[in-house]
Amino acid sequence: LFRSAFIRGKIQVQDVSSMLVAEVADPKKGDYVIDVCAAPGGKSLHMGDKMEGYGTVDARDVSQYKVNLIEENIQRTNSINVQARVQDATIFDQDSELLADVVIADVPCSGYGVIGKKPEIKYRVTPQKQDEIVILQRTILDRAANYVKPRGELIFSTCTIAKEDRS
């Protein structure tokens, strides 16, 4: 029953912490939302659903592979107000400046918040890698902040518990 509902696009599997992003953002019908690191699209789909099909969720990610993941979920769920495109979040998109009611930046991180599910993380993240991640996060946030229109919202999110990833 669960598998059938998932395949038909009636349900979307999402971690509680990911789900909270859309709840905090609370987009309204007609809003324009940009999700800068969107793959595989769960937050974008949730935002579009909360908007009841009105407005647009612009789900972006760095590669065609990641955008394909988003598009598969858009098609599976028949989401009419979510669109996906390749856009490197570290490169400023002048066409999006001051346009978005909500910008979601669920940036790459060390992953310490999901270490229980992915124990190999503790062997993969070095102090140097951590420093590189923080620089990447700050670059993405700097770009994303420019897309928020006056009185809009920028939602910063990571799946980590590392202080460096959250400051």
Question: Locations of the language-model features?
Answer:
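S-adenosylmethionine
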Residues: 2-167
